């Protein structure tokens, strides 16, 4: 059983916004926020996005299809965009492995006081081994900072080998929510069914769905982001991403909506509080938001 009472679930629709490159500065950050408002209005979902989810970006291996340049700090980005997005709160990911305990505590204090309702702790990039990095392990952070951060998140990758045990341990350590990797199959349904049968933890699940524009056919960023060489389940997801990228807009919407329905219908009765995390990996656009609008029309957190 969970030793502590769960915080109230976020029950939210969160939109991922990646901080701009440092060299693009404040104006680009402001334009990102204004684009969210404009695309929300055009797609008819004004007021439906309750949080922005800002990832703490770290340099990964050199195979990344789009070069990783230094990004604006999460906190700096949030302070620029928050006044432009009234009523919207923050979620973020925080890399823990390169900060010692006092430095991480200071960072989390600043994030919490700035309006971040949930912080997901993430580890080293995949070019490094778990345990590398001189700082705090993400699983330790889940318990160390339970008095400081109410909603403490962990990344959940349902197709990853050994993920049942890994996610159970994260919940035991104090994770109150799991944020999934981008979902391009309904593997999360069987994962959560098995998880619910095996233990009594019922963390909130942020189900992540990403729009796939035509550009993916040429660039392959999403294909790279979800990669897990030798994993047939992920290979099938990568094929679905290719299909989405090559599809006409109406077909693309239909395919993504069908996936969304299968996931929502499959996990809705398992007893997990649910939130939705939406991502336009190549940038905010009206076609992405029109797709998100159809998904949210089918089911939205907090809707009767």
Residue ranges and their predicted role:
Residues 41, 197, 261-265:
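Generic structural signal for well-ordered alpha-helical scaffold segments
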Residues 118-155, 159-176, 180, 188, ...:
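Conserved anion-binding
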Residues 202-272:
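Catalytic-face loop-and-helix region of soluble metabolic enzyme cores
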């Amino acid at each position: 059983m969970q030793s502590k009472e769960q915080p109230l679930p976020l029950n939210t629709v969160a939109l991922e916004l990646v901080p701009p490159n440092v060299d693009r500065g404040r104006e680009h950050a402001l334009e990102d926020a204004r684009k969210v408002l404009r695309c929300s209005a055009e797609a008819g979902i004004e007021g439906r996005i309750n949080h922005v989810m800002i990832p703490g970006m770290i340099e990964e291996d050199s195979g990344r299809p789009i070069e990783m340049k230094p990004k604006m700090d999460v906190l700096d980005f949030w302070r620029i965009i928050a006044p432009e997005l009234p009523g919207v709160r923050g979620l973020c990911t925080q890399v823990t492995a390169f900060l010692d305990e006092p430095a991480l505590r200071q960072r989390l204090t600043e994030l919490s006081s700035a309006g971040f309702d949930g912080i997901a702790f993430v580890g080293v990039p995949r070019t490094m081994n778990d345990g590398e990095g001189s700082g705090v392990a993400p699983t330790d952070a889940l318990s160390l900072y339970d008095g400081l951060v109410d909603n403490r998140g962990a990344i959940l990758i349902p197709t990853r080998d050994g993920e049942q045990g890994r996610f159970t341990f994260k919940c035991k350590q104090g994770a109150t929510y799991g944020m999934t990797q981008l979902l391009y199959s309904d593997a999360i349904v069987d994962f959560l069914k098995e998880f619910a049968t095996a233990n009594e933890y019922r963390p909130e699940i942020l189900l992540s769905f990403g729009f796939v524009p035509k550009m993916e056919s040429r660039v392959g960023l999403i294909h790279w982001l979800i990669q897990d060489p030798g994993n047939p389940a992920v290979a099938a997801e990568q094929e679905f991403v290719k299909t989405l990228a090559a599809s006409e807009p109406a077909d693309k919407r239909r395919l993504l909506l069908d996936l969304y329905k299968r996931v929502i219908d499959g996990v809705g009765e398992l007893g997990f509080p649910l939130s939705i995390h939406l991502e336009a990996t190549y940038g905010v656009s009206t076609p992405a938001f029109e797709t998100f609008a159809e998904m949210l029309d089918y089911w939205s957190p907090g809707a009767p």
